[in-house]
């Protein structure tokens, strides 16, 4: 199996739909036959559990602390989709070295077709570093003016740290007096990967702590995420080709924390990876089964129980 593709889902501010997009793309890619791991990279304000209705016993923070292996912190959403959540307690954030994320991400590449990094908002080391780890950065934005400006800043940030911007996805599209997504992506100087219409099914699904792609797969938003997933699959390089990924290389320049990030990256990414982050093989994944700490979607639209 060729190494998987690492995709960072990013946006400058919270509330633009990063986690919604990361989770729904994960489900859509899995439904298309791909194997997917979603890694929650918001180490301070984790919330992916609210989208998937489960309480993890082990998290990415435990992996970074060296107390559990990566496989023990992966949870099965579906047969082809696993999630590595971050800790939800603020105390979990203490003494976390973001550069230690590199070997964790690298260890997942042999076992999955896609590794989706659900990044944090803002400009901080935990935001910057995932942009360096990804083969491509997927920018998420609404069509509102303030969101577009923030998306422009995120693109500039990704480019300054040698990230590769794969394109932009617009969510809650078709509202207000905003120009069409094609014009907005042109303004941003990024390829348009797709747009997700403003759809009440998304809010309904979130109220049920589920992705809309699972809750109402025939909704306009779910179908849009499906098309975006298809586009990503078609644009991925052949398995025999070298990707454009920059994992472990980076090139932070002219940033406040650049020197510190570069130094900690070198310290945290040794050639002899420890047991918690060694490369995994697909057939050795020891994720918790559904019903034993794993989880399954508990309700779909139209269910009466």
What are these regions (language model features)?
Residues 184-216:
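Beta-strand-loop-alpha "switch" segments that mediate conformational coupling across diverse proteins
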Residues 11, 38-110, 205-207, 211:
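P-loop/Walker-type NTP enzyme "switch/lid" segment
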Residues 1-16, 22-35, 54, 63, ...:
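Haloarchaeal acidic low-complexity proteome signature biased toward cell-envelope/secretome components but also
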């Amino acid at each position: 199996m060729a190494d998987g593709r690492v995709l960072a889902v990013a946006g400058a501010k919270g509330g633009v739909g990063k986690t919604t997009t990361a989770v729904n793309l994960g489900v859509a890619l899995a439904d298309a036959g791909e194997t997917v791991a979603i890694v929650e990279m918001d180490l301070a304000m984790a919330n992916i559990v609210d989208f998937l209705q489960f309480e993890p016993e082990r998290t990415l923070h435990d992996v970074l602390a060296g107390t559990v292996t990566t496989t023990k912190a992966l949870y099965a959403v579906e047969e082809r989709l696993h999630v590595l959540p971050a800790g939800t307690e603020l105390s979990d954030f203490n003494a976390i070295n973001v550069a230690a994320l590199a070997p964790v991400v690298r260890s997942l590449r042999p076992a999955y077709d896609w590794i989706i990094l659900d990044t944090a908002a803002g400009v901080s080391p935990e935001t910057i570093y995932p942009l360096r780890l990804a083969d491509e950065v997927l920018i998420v934005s609404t069509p509102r003016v303030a969101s577009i400006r923030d998306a422009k800043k995120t693109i500039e940030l990704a480019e300054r740290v040698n990230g590769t911007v794969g394109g932009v996805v617009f969510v809650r599209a078709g509202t207000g007096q905003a120009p069409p997504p094609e014009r907005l992506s042109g303004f941003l100087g990024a390829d348009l990967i797709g747009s997700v219409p403003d759809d009440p099914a998304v809010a309904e699904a979130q109220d049920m702590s589920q992705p809309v792609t699972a809750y109402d797969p025939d909704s306009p938003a779910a179908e849009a995420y499906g098309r975006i997933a298809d586009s990503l699959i078609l644009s991925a390089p052949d398995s025999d080709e070298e990707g454009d990924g920059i994992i472990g290389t980076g090139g932070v320049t002219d940033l406040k924390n650049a020197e510190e990030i570069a130094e900690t990256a070198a310290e945290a990414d040794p050639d002899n990876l420890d047991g918690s982050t060694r490369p995994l093989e697909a057939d050795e994944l020891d994720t918790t089964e559904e019903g034993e700490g794993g989880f399954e979607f508990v309700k779909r639209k139209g269910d009466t129980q």
